[in-house]
């Protein structure tokens, strides 16, 4: 996370030094690029630090492999082993198939709603309508919660 934040801050400094107005800078942490394991999730968990750089933030997590990995792990954990009848041989492979990119749209919409709730300026997605719905529902709930707290 620190490496990505430092890299974005350095890039921002070069842009400003080259004459780009700070209000024209949008930061994208590059989810899925040169990252592995939990790094994308760690970057998402550190959105506050990214916001602290003082610019709009764009998240492009739609259909990315890190979503598939989370979904595939959950699918595997939910899979119930099927045991063959006595003497019928070995237990067949019970791993569910990996999620195809288009089967990650619900997860992409959920991620978009979550990061929008954290103040992200924009999201890049493949399937816009369900994402708009997810963000709208999350924003409506946030508004009601805020209203009830005042």
Each language-model region and where it sits:
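Active-site-adjacent loop and "lid" segments of alpha/beta metabolic enzymes
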Residues: 1-14, 18, 23, 33-150
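Active-site pre-Tyr helix/loop in NAD(P)-dependent dehydrogenases
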Residues: 30
């Amino acid at each position: 996370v620190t490496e990505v934040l430092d890299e974005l801050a350095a890039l921002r400094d070069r842009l400003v030094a080259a004459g780009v107005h700070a209000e024209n800078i949008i930061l994208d942490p590059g989810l899925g690029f040169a990252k592995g394991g939990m790094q994308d999730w760690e970057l998402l968990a550190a959105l506050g630090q990214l916001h602290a750089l003082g610019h709009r933030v764009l998240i492009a997590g739609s259909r990315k492999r890190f979503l598939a990995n989370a979904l595939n792990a959950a699918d595997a954990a939910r899979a119930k082993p099927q045991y063959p009848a006595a003497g019928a041989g070995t237990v067949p492979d019970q791993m569910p198939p990996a999620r195809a990119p288009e089967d990650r749209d619900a997860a992409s919409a959920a991620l978009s709603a979550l990061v929008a709730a954290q103040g992200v300026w924009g999201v890049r997605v493949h399937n816009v309508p369900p994402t708009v719905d997810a963000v709208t529902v999350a924003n409506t709930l946030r508004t009601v919660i805020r209203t009830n707290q005042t």
